[in-house]
Structure formats: C-alpha cells, structure tokens
Amino acid sequence: MKFTLVATVLLTFSLSAFAVEYPVLTTASPDQVGFDSQKLHRLDGWIQNQIDAGYPSINLLVIKDNHIVLQKAWGYAKKYDGSTLLAHPIRATTNTMYDLASNTKMYATNFALQKLVYEGKIDVNDLVSKYIPGFKDMPGDKIKGKNKLRIIDILHHVAGFPADPQYPNKNVAGKLFSQSKSTTLEMIKKTPLEYQPGSKHIYSDVDYMILGFIIESITAIPLDRYVETTIYKPLGLKHTVFNPLMKGFTPPQIAATELHGNTRDGVIHFPNIRTNTLWGQVHDEKAWYSMGGVSGHAGLFSDTHDMAVLMQVMLNGGGYGNVKLFDDKTVAQFTRRSPEDATFGLGWRVNGNASMTPTFGVLASPQTYGHTGWTGTLTSIDPVNHMAIVILGNRPHSPVANPKVNPNVFVSGLLPAATYGWIVDQIYGSLK
C-alpha cells in the first residue's frame, strides 16, 4: 500500500517535471527590452496625423521577448452612419474587436490545421478528395487536376482555383451562384480550375474555403465551434469569435466597416445585398452570404490582446502557459518557404523577397511571417528578433474614392497608413 502511494507520488512528480510550461505575455516598458522609447513615441504622432486625415482607426500592439511593450488605439470604431458623419463618433479602444478578414486564414484555419497535423489526424500530403466526397474532375472540365490535388497544394495556393469566384453575386458567379453553405460546397466542387495545378501561384479564397470544409469533415463539428472550444477557450481568449453579435457581443464593442453594406457606395447590386453600415457582421461577401458568417477564409473577429496571445503561441513553438496546441516542428513545417513562391509557407506569408516590403517593411528578418487582411489588418511574427506586431484597422469605414472607376478603393486606402510596412519599419527602427 505504502509502496503504491510512493510510486504514484514519484510518477506524478516525474510527469510534472517534464510538463511544458510556455512563456506567457507580461508588460514591460520599451526601454526594458531594447527599444528607444523616444523614437518609438514618434509613431504616435504620425498615426494620429493619419487619423486626422481620414483613416478610421488603428489598434497597434507590439511584443518583444515575451513582453507587450506597446498597446494603443487611435481613431474611431464608428464614425459614419451611411454617408453621414456622426455627431458623436465612437472612439476605438484597446478592447475594440475588429473584422480580421484574411487573417482568419491563419488564426482560425491554419491554427486548426496545425493542431490536427500535430495530433496525427491529417497529413498535408493527403488528397482533398479523402475529406470532401465528390471532389473530382468532371467530364467537361477543360483543365484536369482535382483528382490529384493535395492539401499542401491548397495551402501553397497552387491548386488551380480562381482568386474570387464571387459565389453570392449571381451577376458574376452565374451557374456557381450560392447563398447557402451546403450549396456553396457543391459550387466549389463545380468551380473550374483556371490553370494546371502546380504551374503557377494564385492567392485564392476558395483554397481556404475548402480547408474550412476539410477541418469540419475531420472534427465533425462546425469550424467556429472547433476553434473556439479547442483553441481560443483553453488559451483564455474572450474576444476571438465568428459571428460576434450571435455570441453575446454588441455593436459598440466592434469596429464598423463599409458604409453602405457591400454596395461600394451604391454601384454593386445582387440579391440580399446588405445596404446598411456594417457593424459586427463580417464584411467579406463569400463569408457572409455564402457561408453564414463562418468560413475558412474570413469571418473571425478579435482584439489586439487576443491576437498577441496567438502570435506568442507561434513564437513559443506551439503553446502558451500550460496549453500545448502543436509543437515547434509543426510551426517550422507551416512557416517554411514554398518552393513555388518564397513569399508563402503553408498558408503563412513569409518575408521571402523584396515584394513583401509593403507588408513587413525592410527591417524585419527574412524569417518573418504573418498575414494581412482586406479590412486593414496585419500580423507580423519575427522569430529571429523574438518579436511580433499586430495592426488592426477598419479601413473600409470610409467613402469609396471613385465608385465608378474602382469600387474597391476607399478614401482611407489612399493614405500612407494603408501600407503596413512603414509602420513596421518605424517600430524596428526604434530598436537600440
């Protein structure tokens, strides 16, 4: 009896001795971790000038050596109602939640895939058809290749799919039109390839819509429930969700985006298009109309603190505190440069050549990786300098510059703040 008790105690102690305890974020002054505070402070005035010039809002957080050294909000979470400037606009705070747009691809879909790969539940060399029944070449397809498409081809964006089929817009999608999730999967299967897989690189939302469906096939639960219960909740994240208005959040907690729904100030029309100022609903058309707000390519909302924890997970090699999601080998596998394009890992954008300067600036290490989002979001993770930066913004919350010429260019998108690399360089330039 005594021997059994002693053995149990020793075994428990032995296991606890080998338990991984990852670094967690604490706060520190910039000077404590190698920044020149005076130089870093110059960024404050420059960003405020951009807000004064019309950029809606910017939330910025900087991590260095496991410490949060800068966290600040500028501007307004909501300043317009339609085309009307509010008499009392709602200021952005460091707790404001933002539509992450394509950063969803990394912090929902990639995090889920990295976890599933680590757990041995999926291999990136598996065929897509293993998880999506009916995903195959059709007799009338001009370009074949779906039968042999692997998950790694999807992650590298070399799978042959078009960049944006615009499924919810019948005027553009034609026979591929869909405004329901179940129909959308069938339309994706029918979407013709635009090029022979592996022959070129085209960044495609369809790729990550497919990956979202694959995750749901493996886990047998919706994508949002999987990431919210197995990733965000264990990490203690309270402001990272899909469809926030359905999960207890209110519009004033969230940054607004486009002024007139998805109409680009009245020049785009399709059935069921939103026309009110978007506030708490995902901006992305495919995510909202075709996927019910939850998709592998867009739909996630978060704030800078929660994003900081997720970036720290990557810097830590897969965990945070006593939570382990995946390991450092998985991180290395997913952030390794693609042979087809040095600026891509497995989904992650990588600082592989000068074309990434507008994203990562000129001072970040070549090993830096992250992603951008159409709404005005950037994440930059630098394992060499043990540093990470998140910029959250609501760039579409401004008028369209010239709707008839280019409906996708907003007034705020013409300002220097729309180029993340400049902000990133000011931060790196403040290092001693």
From Swiss-Prot:
It is an enzyme of class 3 (hydrolase). GO terms for cellular component: plasma membrane. InterPro entries: Beta-lactam-related, Beta-lactam/transpept-like, Diverse_Enzym_Activities, Pept_S12_YfeW/YbbE-like. It is a single-pass membrane protein. It is found in: Cell inner membrane. Keywords: Carboxypeptidase, Cell inner membrane, Cell membrane, Hydrolase, Membrane, Protease, Transmembrane, Transmembrane helix. One of its GO terms (molecular function) is serine-type D-Ala-D-Ala carboxypeptidase activity. The keyword Kinase does not apply. The chain crosses the membrane at residues 7-25. One of its GO terms (biological process) is proteolysis. Its main location: membrane. Pfam families: Beta-lactamase. Gene3D superfamilies: DD-peptidase/beta-lactamase superfamily. It catalyses: Preferential cleavage: (Ac)2-L-Lys-D-Ala-|-D-Ala. Also transpeptidation of peptidyl-alanyl moieties that are N-acyl substituents of D-alanine. Its EC number is 3.4.16.4. PANTHER family: BETA-LACTAMASE-RELATED, BETA-LACTAMASE-RELATED DOMAIN-CONTAINING PROTEIN. Belongs to the peptidase S12 family. YfeW subfamily. This is Putative D-alanyl-D-alanine carboxypeptidase. The gene is yfeW.
